[in-house]
Amino acid sequence: PILGSKLTIEAPEHPSQVRVTYSTSPDASGLQWLEPSMTEGKQLPFMFSQSQQIHARSWVPLQDTPSVRYTYSAHVSSRPDVMVLMSADNDPSAIRDGDYTFKMPQRIPSYLMAIAAGDLVFKRISDRSGVWSEPAMLDKAVKEFEDTERMIATAESLYGPYRWDRYDMLVLPPSFPYGGMENPRLTFLTPTVIVGDKT
C-alpha cells in the first residue's frame, strides 16, 4: 500500500492559506466500510475511520505525525438518509440531509481526526455530553453512560476544565473490530461495553 507521497506546492509568496482538492480511495486503509448486514439495524451501510497510527494519510492529505497538530474544517456530502459525524463540533440537532459542515477549533494530531457515517441518532446526557448510535442501541447506550457528566465533573475537579468542550460517544455497529478510540469530541466505542451495569 502507498503510505504517503510528497505534495509540492510552488507559490511565488508565502500564502496564508492553500486549498488542496483531492479524492480518497474506497480502499484507503484508514476507512472501514460496512454493508448493511454488518450493522445493528441492517438497513443502511456504515463507514468509520481508524486513523491510528499512520492511516490518516490514506484518506486526508496531511503531515501524518503526532508532532504536527492542526485545526480543521470540513464539508461532507453524503446520501441524504445517512448521518455524518466527525471528531469536531457535531450538532446534536443537525438535520439528516446529506450536507454537513464541521469545525474543530482545538489543535489535534492527525491520528485523532475521525469520521463516521450511518444510521445514527443522538440522545442528550447533559449540556455537553450525549450518545450517538444506531436507533436500536440508543436507549441501552444512554442508560449505560448516564453517569458521564458526573465523571467529567469529577475529572475536572482534579485536573481542570475539560479541554475539548464536548464529550460525545459514538457506539459503533457490532462488527466494529476495536475496543474504542478516544477521538476528541467523539469517542468511538464498541457495543460490547454496553452490558447493563454501567461498568
Where do the PLM segments sit?
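Hydrophobic helix-coil surface modules that form long, contiguous segments used
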Residues: 50-54, 62-199
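Hydrophobic residues embedded in beta-strands of well-ordered beta-sheets
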Residues: 7, 43-45, 83, 100
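A surface-exposed beta-strand-loop module
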Residues: 1-39, 101
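Core domains of carbohydrate- and sulfate-ester-processing enzymes
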Residues: 25, 29-66, 112
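Compositionally biased, intrinsically disordered/low-complexity regions enriched for serine, proline
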Residues: 9-12, 42, 58, 89
